[in-house]
A protein has these predicted regions:
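A mature extracytoplasmic/lumenal domain signature
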Residues: 53-55, 60-62, 84, 95-97, ...
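Surface-exposed helix/loop patches within compact recognition domains
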Residues: 64-159
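Acidic/polar, low-complexity intrinsically disordered N-terminal segments immediately downstream
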Residues: 20-77, 202
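Short acidic/polar mixed-charge low-complexity motifs
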Residues: 54, 87-89, 179-180
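Extracellular low-complexity Ser/Thr/Asn/Gly-rich intrinsically disordered segments
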Residues: 2, 17, 41, 75, ...
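Short capping micro-motif at the N-terminus of alpha-helices
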Residues: 58-59, 119, 183
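Sec-dependent bacterial lipoprotein signal peptides
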Residues: 1-18
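C-terminal or internal capping secondary-structure element at the end of a domain, subdomain, or sheet
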Residues: 144-202
Length: 202
């Protein structure tokens, strides 16, 4: 069943906003994970993780959504634009999505609610890579996962606003020289609509 959120008293400040305001990032530091945004399920358009104890986080605060999702006939690709040590670094997840998910538009992301995908290098699991300025190279993935903890629909003033996609991830990978790459504490809280969901399945 599709989940529906009616923004009411608890989100009074958000009800006064226009739809365009949902595209802004709302960054709140996590006191338990210094440098990362809190884990949230409010569509704050933030994400982050530690990469070998270095902070990877959303590329800009307060700007338009710095991420996008692309669906085709075989997979769903989620690209998170970010920073690590002052340089551009993008984290790209590729999830195997078969026809049972019917990802025709962003509302269909609700079918992923509560789903968890293992991360490794097999065709039936989620894969991940880095892009950007001198990104780490991954040659193998030892173990990991990405979980969609909560996916929910937001209605504001009786109109569809967005789908909130929130979840967690972590994985251990290895580079070409055998060096280990540990990604831990990963979290994302994304507001998705027709502006950042692209469908190539048609």
């Amino acid at each position: 069943m599709k989940k529906l959120i009616i923004i009411a008293a608890a989100l009074l400040a958000m009800t006064a906003c226009s739809k365009s305001d949902f595209k802004q990032t709302q960054y709140i530091d996590d006191p338990d994970y210094p440098g990362l945004p809190i884990y949230s399920e409010m569509g704050y358009n933030t994400y982050g993780a530690y990469i070998n104890e270095q902070v990877f986080t959303v590329s800009s605060h307060g700007s338009n959504r710095p991420f996008y999702l692309v669906a085709d006939r075989e997979c769903l690709t989620m690209t998170l634009y970010g920073w690590r040590e002052g340089t551009n670094l993008n984290m790209v997840f590729t999830l195997p999505i078969d026809s049972t998910y019917h990802l025709e538009d962003y509302h269909d992301l609700l079918t992923l609610d509560g789903k968890r995908f293992d991360i490794d290098t097999t065709a039936t699991s989620c894969n991940v890579k880095f892009e950007g300025y001198y990104p780490p190279t991954i040659t193998s993935i030892y173990s990991g996962y990405i979980s969609f903890e909560k996916i929910q629909q937001v209605i504001v003033d009786k109109e569809d606003a967005e789908i909130i996609v929130s979840g967690k991830f972590q994985f251990r990978a290895f580079g070409p020289d055998g060096n280990r790459l540990d990604v831990v504490g990963g979290r994302f809280d994304l507001g998705v609509d027709q502006t950042n969901f692209i469908n190539f399945r048609r």
